[in-house]
Amino acid sequence: MLGAALRRCAVAAAARAGPRGLLHSAPTPGPAAAIQSVRCYSHGSSETDEEFDARWVTYFNKPDIDAWELRKGINTLVTYDLVPEPKIIDAALRACRRLNDFASTVRILEAVKDKAGPHKEIYPYVIQELRPTLNELGISTPEELGLDKV
């Protein structure tokens, strides 16, 4: 990206210089033409783990959540570099149940297993924490459905 900006400046300087070349009577570029090294970092406040969890639980607990918002929330949550806390997954599963979206419940549980990666103790812990909710809502895990063997 910086190389392209340098090329554009060189081409513009050559065009301004005319046929006599760059060393003769080229006007000096103003401060606006100078290339600056600028890094765009976020200067917003950082969110604590508790605030993050509360934000997602509140999102999935919205009484008027629709199927599109549910899928959008799940997709966004899956993009984070973390395994969601069981209370977030609980809220998402309850939202799926309110919408009668069984496929999304299986997708959420598969995503949690995938996000756990090589840490084999995380997924069983999450399922253990969610077991009362799974039983209450009548949700089967992908393993109970035989989807882990496909």
Curated annotation (Swiss-Prot):
Q: Which GO terms describe its cellular component?
A: mitochondrial inner membrane; respiratory chain complex IV
Looking at the record's lineage, which domain of life comes first? Eukaryota
One Pfam entry for this protein is COX5A
The record's subunit annotation is: Component of the cytochrome c oxidase (complex IV, CIV), a multisubunit enzyme composed of 14 subunits. The complex is composed of a catalytic core of 3 subunits MT-CO1, MT-CO2 and MT-CO3, encoded in the mitochondrial DNA, and 11 supernumerary subunits COX4I, COX5A, COX5B, COX6A, COX6B, COX6C, COX7A, COX7B, COX7C, COX8 and NDUFA4, which are encoded in the nuclear genome.
The stretch annotated as transit peptide is 1-41
Q: Share the record's PTM remark.
A: In response to mitochondrial stress, the precursor protein is ubiquitinated by the SIFI complex in the cytoplasm before mitochondrial import, leading to its degradation. Within the SIFI complex, UBR4 initiates ubiquitin chain that are further elongated or branched by KCMF1.
Its placement in the membrane is given as: Peripheral membrane protein
Q: What is its main location?
A: mitochondrion
What is its subcellular localisation?
Answer: Mitochondrion inner membrane
SIFI-degron (motif): residue ranges: 2-17
Which biological pathway?
Energy metabolism; oxidative phosphorylation
Q: Which gene underlies this protein?
A: COX5A
Spell out the protein name for this chain: Cytochrome c oxidase subunit 5A, mitochondrial
Q: What is the role of the protein in this entry? A: Component of the cytochrome c oxidase, the last enzyme in the mitochondrial electron transport chain which drives oxidative phosphorylation. The respiratory chain contains 3 multisubunit complexes succinate dehydrogenase (complex II, CII), ubiquinol-cytochrome c oxidoreductase (cytochrome b-c1 complex, complex III, CIII) and cytochrome c oxidase (complex IV, CIV), that cooperate to transfer electrons derived from NADH and succinate to molecular oxygen, creating an electrochemical gradient over the inner membrane that drives transmembrane transport and the ATP synthase.
